[in-house]
């Protein structure tokens, strides 16, 4: 592959991740962009010193994370857990469990008074949980997705993922 075609492919991937509504992006590119966004928000939350900013960041995290996890469970984890390989079933079940823990921690964080020791502790735990989850998902689940689904199927998964996100209401 030439340098020019490599740059064109990289540009297409980045543009697709930035404008996922086009629906012709691999699900993994969309998930990568969303993981990066949430991890950035969590980093900012754990560094924030003001209650106002912390409250705003928690809301932004909820708006990003709740639809992401629900749609990901429907479009990625359910098909992975349905595969015949035991490792795939375990990886899928682990993803569901980590999503449940993240959701519970996020709801706890949302109920706490910002800029208190309890709030800061919950924010730190949520960040650590998401960091761990993303690392494992990107290593294990994504390998399963690449191994078991064609590029066309992954593009369809992306369209399904984006549609599923629109159906999720954020509390």
Residue ranges with predicted function:
Residues 1-171:
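Small-residue-biased structural context
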């Amino acid at each position: 592959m030439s340098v020019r075609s490599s740059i064109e492919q990289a540009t297409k991937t980045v543009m697709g991740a930035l404008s996922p509504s086009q629906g012709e992006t691999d699900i993994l590119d969309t998930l990568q962009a969303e993981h990066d966004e949430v991890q950035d928000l969590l980093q900012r939350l754990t560094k924030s010193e003001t209650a106002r900013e912390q409250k705003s960041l928690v809301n932004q995290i909820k708006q990003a994370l709740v639809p992401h996890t629900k749609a990901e469970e429907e479009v990625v984890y359910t098909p992975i857990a349905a595969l015949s390989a035991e490792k795939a079933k375990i990886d899928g079940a682990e993803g569901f469990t980590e999503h449940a823990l993240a959701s519970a921690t996020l709801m706890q964080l949302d109920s706490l008074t910002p800029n208190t020791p309890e709030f800061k502790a919950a924010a730190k735990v949520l960040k650590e949980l998401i960091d761990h989850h993303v690392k494992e998902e990107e290593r294990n689940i994504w390998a399963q997705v690449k191994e078991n689904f064609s590029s066309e199927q992954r593009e369809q998964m992306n369209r399904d993922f984006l549609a599923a996100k629109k159906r999720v209401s954020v509390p």
